[in-house]
Amino acid sequence: MNGAAGGDTQGKMTAPKDQDQWSQEDMLTLLQTMKTLLPGQDNSKFKTTESHLDWNKLAFKHYSGSMCRQKWMEISNEVRKFRTLTELILDADEHVRHPYKGKKLKKHPEFPKKPLTPYFRFFMEKRAKYAKLHPEMSNLDLTKILSKKYKELPEKKKMKYIQDFQREKQDFERNMAKFREEHPDLMQNPKKSDVPEKPKTPQQLWYNHERKVYLKLHADASTKDIKDALGKQWSQLPDKKRLKWIHKALEQRKQYEGVMREYMQKHPELNITEEGITRSTLTKAERQLKDKFDGRPTKPPPNSYSMYCAELMANMKDVPSTERMVLCSQRWKLLSQKEKDAYHKKCEQRKKDYEVELMRFLENLPEEEQQRVLAEEKMVGMKRKRTNTPASKMATEDAAKVKSRSGQADKKKAAEERAKLPETPKTAEEIWQQSVIGDYLARFKNDRAKALKVMEATWLNMEKKEKIMWIKKAAEDQKRYERELSDMRSTPAPTTAGKKVKFLGEPKKAPMNGYQKFSQELLSNGELNHLPLKERMVEIGSRWHRISPTQKDYYKKLAEDQQRLYRTQFDTWMKGLSTQDRAAYKEQNTNKRKSTTKIQAPSSKSKLVIQSKSDDDEDDEDDEDEEDDDDDDDEDKEDSSEDGDSSDSSSDEDSEEGEENEDEEDEEDDDEDNEEDDDDNESGSSSSSSSSADSSDSDSN
């Protein structure tokens, strides 16, 4: 206790008395733990050492670090912080008996003298000569001149000083070993803490290795010179060599985790958190480098403008960085809308490819690394509409495990209600903003806040005739919303009852085959949003027929990859469910299968009926003479045979499309599901009308 007498007043802090909460045993545990955290040579003022303590390491039981600090303040306020004469005499007695301890060890008459470094040898040799030549110079100026002269010395002359230093250094080491043998009482090392040494970063490991090599070549180098030289070397180190030290750092961290967990079992009072043990020793750049070599795909630009800028900047290395963005913005504005749309499509395609590549990358990673990658993907703000991607699936799954089970039923219900409602209609201003946001972002260098502010002002100052087009679009969107809402309300109850209620964290189903993946892609990118649902599905079918077998195989492979990942995620999710939730999930799925079978059984037939109806309509238009009943009968027979042939030839694709319909609930919004149900009803009515038409023909015949 080396503080001054005034330390008593300085050390006082207002802290609430909580003696009732702290038992004597707890207070003694706190003091004992504080002793273990004190430095080996505690020669500083108590206030200094106290300020350097890591109070979080003192936490134990239910006492946090701040509570431990508060309790220490209370206890220390009750203890005097000045020394009595008796204590000083005891210290003085110890000093007289053992005068050569601590930092004064080198004052022992027999302690070996350290050899001078090569530079100091040169300095001592030349100093007197230069002092006579330049008597007006100060010691500092002389030192600067001699330092410069030494650096300019030829290697041959410099080697003489280095060899002398190395010879004397060997003598010093021999004499030091002899001194240790003769004076073991003076060489007692302070007891080292048994806390495992923290793992080093890749740069620290590399520095320790290279430092030894550097000192062999530059024995006279100072610590600053070594740090500067090696720091420059590290910044220029090739990625492959840097990766070697990254792997070594990761291995060391794994070893540290194992040793530290054993240490925690022996010292439970330290209450070290799991985060403190598993904290990464890699920087963000080092982590990205390792991921890149492991095969992690590069994240694509977030939008078409960013993609355009990235492509343009690759050829603008000679242009100053301040001017690059200005040039990009100007050139983007000169592009036609068609060219901008092409970049938009290209950007969307890259995002899809990235998701597939990321899935493949995740499959080869251990679970711990998967969680890290998914957390990083979540942090950078993946779009909500892409929650069906594997990364967001698993991130949601992790979040579900962390959240409390209480109130889950209410959350599920609220989520279901939100999912049932169609997309809210947009205002005229919102539709206009969506169409011009790219240009404004380019103008303000991707500063969204500024762009939105200027867009609002532009809209307010816009003339009414310029707004008419957007007002009409908003009115159409409002009608769409009302139509979808009325369709949803008029949907029969059994169809809704058959729908699957989502469990929290449940992974979304992957496409079952190539056709489903193909249609999912077309529906999600918004390319067919201008078409009604029925025409949308017809267009998807016709496009599927037109693509080559190679492209179909590509979509089939994508679907298989997603299926494999889905099964892995689904198994993990099921294991995390409680017994009660698992039983409820299985029961619901059983009921869903039954209801789905009843509702969707005639789907393949209804397709044939729709086709036959369209053929009948064409026949009715061509056949203007309704009195010729025999010709009608012949045409009906031919139609039926054609229908049979077409059903045989497209049976495989129908089966794929049938599976697509089974998963429509997972792939589309509820309004689309309702419209599909309406399609089924229409197909049913069309089948009845066609059959009645056939019967009327036969009657007339």
Curated annotation (Swiss-Prot):
Residues 683-695 have a biased composition (Low complexity). Residues 408-426 have a biased composition (Basic and acidic residues). It is found in: Nucleus. GO terms for cellular component: nucleolus; nucleus. It comes from Xenopus laevis. This is Nucleolar transcription factor 1-B. Residues 597-612 have a biased composition (Polar residues). The gene is ubtf-b. Residues 112-180, 196-264, 298-362, 422-489, 508-574 bind DNA.
